[in-house]
């Protein structure tokens, strides 16, 4: 059964009526209301298109968090072959919130990083809801070093509310691990492409997104803090999260305008959760285009282009 967000109620009602009419139409009793069903389906699709063409930043945040939205594991299955995960940071342990692997992307050998939130109670706990600990970011550095050593492009898929803020994580050097991961990404001699597929929260996101090309799915969000966190700090009132989301400029459209991301990946009407296969295919095409634009650059040119990209952020605001 499809899960609807609160603001999708008008669409939900129309689609419920479509299902009711389909149930009434039976070939056995000669009743056919196909024309009426088709007309109502058209209205529902039109309502959905209009709704998603004018989503507020807060509504986009809810879409980015939709429980049925495709996660890293879904993208990994749809985009890569010969996917071979690597475990552990060689210092403390394994962190399943951040996955690292060797793989092939459309026949080309690559390294892959990505946050995994999980889709069931069991997997969400195992992956810590996509909130990586220091060992996750140290594993990311390890993957980046392997990418550099073997001359493999790096593809990162970002989907996290932020790095895990627990006491143990802080004791093991969370801030240092994030900083080193960000630095490693900026210093890579191979091309790297990052895609924000859902939430891109704070340093936990940018730690694997310091890339030559940064892409965002159409209804993803990318920010220094969650809207709820910003509202709590600024107004001491989490109910103002919608206002915070608007003021923070967290949408792909705003961030493209500011030069923080390089391109937007169009999602199916109604969001990636309505047609994960199409969303994943569009993401793959965007990654291929981004990687193609970086092909042929030597290590020095790759680093210079990346450095220039990040130094330019904010100059035209």
Swiss-Prot record:
It is an enzyme of class 2 (transferase). One of its GO terms (biological process) is malonyl-CoA biosynthetic process. Component of the acetyl coenzyme A carboxylase (ACC) complex. First, biotin carboxylase catalyzes the carboxylation of biotin on its carrier protein (BCCP) and then the CO(2) group is transferred by the carboxyltransferase to acetyl-CoA to form malonyl-CoA. It catalyses: N(6)-carboxybiotinyl-L-lysyl-[protein] + acetyl-CoA = N(6)-biotinyl-L-lysyl-[protein] + malonyl-CoA. This is Acetyl-coenzyme A carboxylase carboxyl transferase subunit alpha. GO terms for cellular component: acetyl-CoA carboxylase complex. It is found in: Cytoplasm. It holds the Pfam family ACCA. It comes from Azorhizobium caulinodans (strain ATCC 43989 / DSM 5975 / JCM 20966 / LMG 6465 / NBRC 14845 / NCIMB 13405 / ORS 571). Gene3D superfamilies: 2-enoyl-CoA Hydratase, Chain A, domain 1. Residues 39-293 form the CoA carboxyltransferase C-terminal domain.
């Amino acid at each position: 059964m499809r899960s609807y967000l609160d603001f999708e109620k008008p669409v939900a009602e129309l689609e419920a009526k479509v299902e009711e009419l389909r149930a009434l139409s039976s070939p056995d009793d000669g009743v056919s209301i196909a024309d009426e069903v088709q007309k109502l389906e058209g209205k529902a699709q039109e309502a959905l298109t209009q709704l998603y063409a004018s989503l507020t930043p807060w509504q986009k945040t809810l879409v980015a968090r939709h429980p049925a939205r495709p996660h890293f594991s879904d993208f990994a299955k749809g985009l890569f072959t010969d996917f071979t995960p690597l475990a552990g940071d060689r210092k403390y342990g394994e962190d399943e919130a951040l996955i690292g692997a060797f793989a092939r992307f459309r026949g080309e050998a690559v390294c892959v990083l990505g946050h995994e939130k999980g889709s069931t109670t069991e997997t969400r706990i195992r992956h810590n809801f996509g909130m990586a600990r220091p060992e996750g970011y140290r594993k990311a550095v390890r993957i980046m070093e392997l990418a550099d050593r073997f001359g493999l492009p790096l593809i990162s898929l970002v989907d996290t509310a932020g790095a895990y803020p627990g006491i143990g994580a802080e004791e093991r050097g969370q801030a240092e691990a994030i900083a080193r991961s960000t630095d490693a990404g900026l210093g890579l001699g191979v091309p790297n492409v990052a895609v924000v597929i859902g939430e891109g929260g704070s340093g936990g996101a940018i730690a694997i997104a310091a890339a030559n090309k940064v892409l965002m799915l159409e209804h993803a969000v990318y920010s220094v803090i969650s809207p709820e966190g910003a509202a709590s700090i600024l107004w001491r009132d989490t109910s103002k999260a919608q206002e915070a989301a608007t003021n923070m400029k967290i949408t792909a459209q705003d961030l493209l305008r500011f030069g923080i991301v390089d391109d937007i990946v169009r999602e199916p009407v109604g969001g990636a959760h309505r047609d994960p296969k199409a969303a994943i295919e569009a993401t793959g095409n965007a990654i291929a285009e981004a990687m193609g634009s970086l092909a042929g650059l030597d290590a020095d040119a790759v680093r210079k282009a990346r450095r220039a990209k990040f130094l330019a952020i904010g100059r035209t605001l």
